[in-house]
Amino acid sequence: VVAVYSQPLIVDSSITPTEIVQNTLVGSGITPTNIKFNKSLSNALITRDQIGVFTNGQGTNLGLASGVVLSTGQVQYAGGPNNQNGASHPTLIPIANDADLALLSSNSIQNIATVEFDFVSTGTEIGLDFIYASEDYPEYATSSFSDVMGIFLSGPDIAGPYSNNAKNIALLPSTSIPISTNSV
């Protein structure tokens, strides 16, 4: 019998949210501005334990080799195992409200991790690969604890029910159902 183990994600939270957006989240041909982390321009200029970049994804079942990780807890524990005291809570006081995320859940939002920015693209199309994971899944699926995910896009010719007429593009495949621990 040969046992093969996945290699853990490598997570780096020593980079500011602004640097993460500029150097990892957006690609060539996209210029981001007005970068905010948890509703604040100044929060985006210092390192935070709720956002980081990951590498070594090819050693896991994620389907992405590298990218950005957001957490309502501490991203350093994102690779698991899920056995760390305090991993579910950021070291700073979390922000607990977001009008758009609140529309995605019938339950109250307890804490959030948000990155917001404006961008201009030189192309006619943009793409984004994302993966949703929750420490609350599957233990709290169909309960009053419901982690939600939203990716809100607004701009010319976009008309949606969220702030700035945005649409949520974080939906279950081929549906209009928002992604949450209660919907996956």
Question: Which residue ranges define each predicted feature?
Answer:
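Aromatic (Trp/Tyr/Phe) and Gly/Pro-enriched flexible surface segments
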Residues: V4-V184
